[in-house]
Amino acid sequence: MSTIVRLLENRSVRKRRHDLPALKGLVAPGPDVRLLDIGGGAGIATVRFASGCRRIVILEPDPRKLRYGRRANPPLSFVRGKAEALPFPDDSFERVAAVVSFHHVGDPDRALREIRRVLSPGGRLVLHELYPEAHAGWFARVLGRRLHGSPPSFYEPDALRRILVAHGFRDISVTDGERGYFVTGSR
């Protein structure tokens, strides 16, 4: 199974390779930054945009990806879980990223409350998402249900901005990427 996970992870990184430099700029890794990557899989992309962080934690619900990630990226910490119930104390991270994964969250309101809770004061949320018109077709719904238990919920950038505002995030920005868009907000 690790061969399949490796192939899928590498394919995902190849598809997003043009967005990784922008993502790294938004995450702004540094020696004082603790990063949580929600839905980070085996961490293959994470090491490309977050290297230089003091601590990198991958939160992933798929045990196969966690097993592969622990072997492939031993310096990273891997935790099984979902965004709706983050198993971390308050103020644990200066950055939280969700790279092409927020649309898989079953309860976005609960997830954003949890994300805000674990972000330290002044910490930043970085979302990289896909445009609905390009990815919300029947194939995405079927594949999402098969792989994640429910179909994905793709958001327009302005809708995601409004959701972040409603959850108390500030300094929100939306920028276009090569294969999607970025939304950032601070606690």
Say what each PLM segment does.
Residues 97:
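A conserved beta-strand element that flanks and buttresses the S-adenosyl-L-methionine
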